């Protein structure tokens, strides 16, 4: 095959990404070939596979690609808004599937278990989000919920909403989680204050606050592990 100067329709049947997937299965395709299926077509001078290879080379890895926005993707020649939206949507579906699989498996026995559940959800976001894991008496996760979404510097949490959702889910324990997009693990004074406020309210309602995790891309800070609780 003479490289990237031919449109995919001119390639041999064995080299076309869609046909290759049908014949050999999805596992047989490279990342660039899978992305080429999403893109659908390239240009006169560049195939969809070559365009995908160029984007992947720029992103370095799939994790970095997932962080790209539509506005960033359309800067690549050959990628319009529709193609960019398709890429972003597909990557987001993959992230959600991964997060769901992890959640189904988990009984919380340590702060690391909570981190494993929440890192794929908030660990790599460019903005701050505050979430709660709702647990039963066996420390199994019943549900999870986003309480607030903010900017780079912080987010506001409604304490009443924390316990409204907790009681609706029949939870006996909660784990608070939020991310720091800056990568800074240490809690701010505001982090400590909201934790204390929620913990005090939980004692009144007989709902135990088991921990509060600050999550970044690769690490986490546990209030319990650090002796703040």
From Swiss-Prot:
CDD domains assigned: MPN_DUF2466 (cd08071)
PROSITE patterns tied to this protein: MPN (PS50249), UPF0758 (PS01302)
Gene Ontology MF annotations: metal ion binding; metallopeptidase activity
Name of the protein described by the UniProt record: UPF0758 protein Fjoh_0413
Cystine bridges: none
Domain of life, per lineage: Bacteria
Sequence motif JAMM motif, residues: 178-191
Natural source organism: Flavobacterium johnsoniae (strain ATCC 17061 / DSM 2064 / JCM 8514 / BCRC 14874 / CCUG 350202 / NBRC 14942 / NCIMB 11054 / UW101)
Residue stretches making up the MPN domain: 107-229
